[in-house]
Amino acid sequence: MRAIGVFEYITLRAVLACATALLIGLVAGPRVIRRLTEMKIGQAVRAYGPESHLVKTGTPTMGGALILIAIAISTLLWADWTNRFVWVVLLVTFGFGWIGWMDDYRKVVYRDPEGMPARQKFFWQATIGLVAAVYLAFAVSAPANTELWPLFKAWVGSGFTMPLPTRADLIVPFFKSVSYPLGVLGFVALTWAVIVGTSNAVNLTDGLDGLAIMPTVMVGSALGIFAYVVGRVDYSKYLLFPYIPGAAELMVLCAAIGGAGLAFLWFNAYPAQVFMGDVGALALGGALGTIAVIVRQEIVLFIMGGVFVVETLSVMVQVTWFKYTKRKYGQGRRIFRMAPLHHHFEVGGWKETQVVVRFWIITMMLVLVGLSTLKLR
């Protein structure tokens, strides 16, 4: 009985979840790649991308499905099935994975590098993000095992003015006990933006071999540490974080993300044998955003995921400036040689591996900055 009791420890189950996901990915990876190759599910490279990427045409894609399967099996093996946060993260992850799958399907079957129309993709992202945001507004606020429907009815009955408890506030890192109350609508709006924004940010970053997956592993692992802290009464009190009942269980899921991500990197490292595709990138981004919201570390996610943020901003700035100058001068002008930012450096002469490893180093430093907020307050 004592031997069985050790599995009650979240830290042990997190280690086992990581090892299980890693093993599943490494064992199943070659079979999945071989099957994708036989089915001719190859990458369609955009014509306006760097010329050096044309050699990637035909490389198996949609390998993100392997990541999701490894995460799901590992999480269901080692996590607490009664934990509402585990389920909401899994559902969001697979919801965004479904969007990515449909997008990749159009690219592969119809040989359309653009995939699903942008408006259609955003509609489904916005819908899933909104449902998750409304649910989390009450799930984060409520004590463990509390029914959420009565809370929702109470909020509606109050004329949509019912405040949320302080643990649902927006936490400002590096400052002791500084937070801002959001209210239900503010919480929903912020959560929606974080989930949808992170999903798209990871997807935009996934443009070079190994570029997106390693930062995802690092950020996800760090969020697992935050989940463990805020999910424990003693640690959260000592470190001045809000106590979120049940959040510690997300450490198991974060560990599964780390293990599955490392297994995928084995095959995605330059020169990549397989790409994760939108099915992986959108799903992993959605998972990171959802976990960050639950552990109340939205701003810290912004810091640790700085590479994702800068990649996204580079696209937004490039598109906005191009449209503005085209309207004003009759010819569009660019700020970057090419967007997203990793292509800017490629066109500037950096080797693909240089861009990837340097972005990894930057992410590692940013994650350390994020983790420092556990104590530097």
Swiss-Prot record:
- Cofactor needs: Mg(2+)
Reactions catalysed according to its record:
UDP-N-acetyl-alpha-D-muramoyl-L-alanyl-gamma-D-glutamyl-meso-2,6-diaminopimeloyl-D-alanyl-D-alanine + di-trans,octa-cis-undecaprenyl phosphate = di-trans,octa-cis-undecaprenyl diphospho-N-acetyl-alpha-D-muramoyl-L-alanyl-D-glutamyl-meso-2,6-diaminopimeloyl-D-alanyl-D-alanine + UMP
Question: What is the role of the protein in this entry?
Answer: Catalyzes the initial step of the lipid cycle reactions in the biosynthesis of the cell wall peptidoglycan: transfers peptidoglycan precursor phospho-MurNAc-pentapeptide from UDP-MurNAc-pentapeptide onto the lipid carrier undecaprenyl phosphate, yielding undecaprenyl-pyrophosphoryl-MurNAc-pentapeptide, known as lipid I.
For this protein, the parts annotated as crossing the membrane are: 9-29, 59-79, 85-105, 122-142, 155-175, 178-198, 210-230, 247-267, 274-294, 299-319, 354-374
Q: Which keywords has UniProt assigned to this entry?
A: Cell cycle, Cell division, Cell inner membrane, Cell membrane, Cell shape, Cell wall biogenesis/degradation, Magnesium, Membrane, Metal-binding, Peptidoglycan synthesis, Transferase, Transmembrane, Transmembrane helix
Q: What gene name is listed for this protein?
A: mraY
**How is this protein positioned relative to the membrane?**
Multi-pass membrane protein
Tell me which species this is from: Bordetella pertussis (strain Tohama I / ATCC BAA-589 / NCTC 13251)
Write down the EC number: 2.7.8.13
Looking up InterPro entries in the UniProt record yields: Glycosyl_transferase_4, PNAcMuramoyl-5peptid_Trfase, PNAcMuramoyl-5peptid_Trfase_CS
What Gene Ontology cellular-component terms does the record carry? plasma membrane
Gene Ontology BP terms: cell division; cell wall organization; peptidoglycan biosynthetic process; regulation of cell shape
Q: Which family does it belong to?
A: Belongs to the glycosyltransferase 4 family. MraY subfamily.
Full protein name? Phospho-N-acetylmuramoyl-pentapeptide-transferase
